[in-house]
Amino acid sequence: MGDDRAVIKFSSEDCGICHKMSFYDQKVTEELGLRFIDVKMQDTATYRKYRQVLLTQYPDKSAMGWPTYLVCEAPEGEFQILGEVKGGHPKGEFRSRLQAILELATIEPSS
């Protein structure tokens, strides 16, 4: 598969749930064959690189969760958002939510 699919985690240094999720979010993401991109809002260079992806989903950032995981294709190029996982979840549920997004993306080619 030539797909460049990634999970972009938007989080904040002072977010306790974000920190807790970091014990397994990257591992689960990579086990599912996706790249993991960690974007902390305080890291302006990295945030600037992926800001457009976040603003496409949340134009004013008000409804985003902490953390917000956006599953997307070609995150550095003509990206397409496939789905999202918002907030903190136990490891098993986080995996299930990512798998559900991937299954939908495989079944329904987006228009």
Model-derived features: positions:
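Local sequence-structure signature of Cys/Sec-based thiol-disulfide redox active-site neighborhoods
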Residues: 1-35
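Thiol-based oxidoreductase modules, predominantly thioredoxin-like and allied folds used
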Residues: 10-11, 32-52
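Chalcogenol-based redox active-site neighborhoods
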Residues: 16-26, 44-45, 49, 53-64
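Catalytic cores of transferase enzymes with a strong primary signal for eukaryotic protein kinases
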Residues: 36-40, 61, 70
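Non-catalytic, surface beta->alpha helical segment in thiol-disulfide oxidoreductase systems
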Residues: 64-110
